[in-house]
């Protein structure tokens, strides 16, 4: 008989609080010596149905050429209306010692409420951040920040009004990965910039940017980099979700002021390092990622990936080889959501995907890794993102047909679409119709690929004499990509059972298709209460889990990991609460809330009658 014990998860973590102080303008930095009430230009106020012309102030004819112009596209959304995250980052900019070598220009919009007295949510407004605080330069009719014409209009205006040697465009908002895109506008039904729309806007502007940055979640993807590679020299973005505090604006902007001759790689490195330091300070560093990508190296990476995809399609006619590939792929580091409660982003690390499958795609894997490491010129990552290599790629872990259709619009490889067609049994390339990315060529379909209809899986389950639960496959085992177990609590008095989680702690014989449980009479608990513990990712040195809870009455997911100290022992770490992805828009939450003393946590479990 196995003893029932429990493992307690420590809650000794702090919570970083966002505050919404008012700050504009800054009289202490008023170099002109005039009263601070005059440092903000008064734009003509008209009805919001009409465009407002440029306020008096600097234009192309009066502004001297700078070394850098930073164009911050700040879509406040719920990050600002609920927590003042945008205001906090603008506050950070007020601690910078400015000079004339760098123009820092901001467009605001996309939120119902700004947590300060200066910015008006009824307009698109444009500001300059300098020693005098924020100066209102221009305001326009309210429009969706998720509309490509809104973006291109701001960029063209900023480039014309503030000429410089180098330009940086920075996106501030939520991100949702390759399919969902970026810049979700709260005022316009979470309208976002998809990758095709992002490319459309940059093409309209026609400017080469030194840095294209994403202070958002999940946008350091191969598909995003490929979309913008014609229009920038470097991309700075995160594979994983970002905490609500975002980048360290005081630190990296001050570096730019002090080193205006720096190139995009140098500035990008400072953005990464200062961001990671900020995450360390707030306790969010374990899951942090940020990378600098040389966009000029992306075409070579896309070519190498297409060659690997060709090799991948070549194995789809042999089920055992395909099984080996998919088993390796699902072990790759994945980002964002990976449970029903969190939602699925289907973004995996390109490097880890390749490393985990290189025995199967041995002819092309090395070329992909070489091109990847050549493109990612700098990156930072936390201890539980140890396999993050700087760029993720879409992989169909759990997708709908509609998501596959959307991916076809942004895919970098026609051969990869053919591979997806095989592993997603109810989708075909023809379903995407004419919406396939026109930049790629989709090869003719092979008639030899395996299909799910060809395989019937038969198995037996039984409990051995010593009390272990066995699963033995009799037929169709070659089509199985993974085996995990569900753990249930049975209440015989009430005739109910509750799902307590999903894990992979099994004794596995993949050669013979035999598996049995490794249950040792223990299960994770939070302050003595068992939890629904769901495996998100199996890492080399850790397993990452998600626990559905309510925190102070709000549904969310507690992220935790089991980290191995030795081959046989380890410990739990709690990383905080993340609400996951919006089920309609695909927008990723940016708020990571750490548990603190006094929080009220309710553990959620699925219970059913038998």
Model-predicted regions and their roles:
Residues 8-19:
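Bacterial N-terminal signal peptides
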Residues 1-4:
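Positively charged n-region of N-terminal signal peptides that target proteins for export
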Residues 158-178:
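Active-site groove signature of glycoside hydrolases
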Residues 29-59:
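N-terminal, intrinsically disordered, polar/charged segments of Gram-positive cell-envelope systems
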Residues 50-63, 175-178, 182-610:
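Terminal, contiguous helix-loop blocks that mediate binding/assembly
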Residues 22-25:
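Bacterial signal peptide processing site
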Residues 52-163:
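N-terminal extension/subdomain marker
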Residues 69-74, 103-108, 167-171, 210-214, ...:
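Structural recognition of the beta-strand scaffold that forms the well-ordered cores
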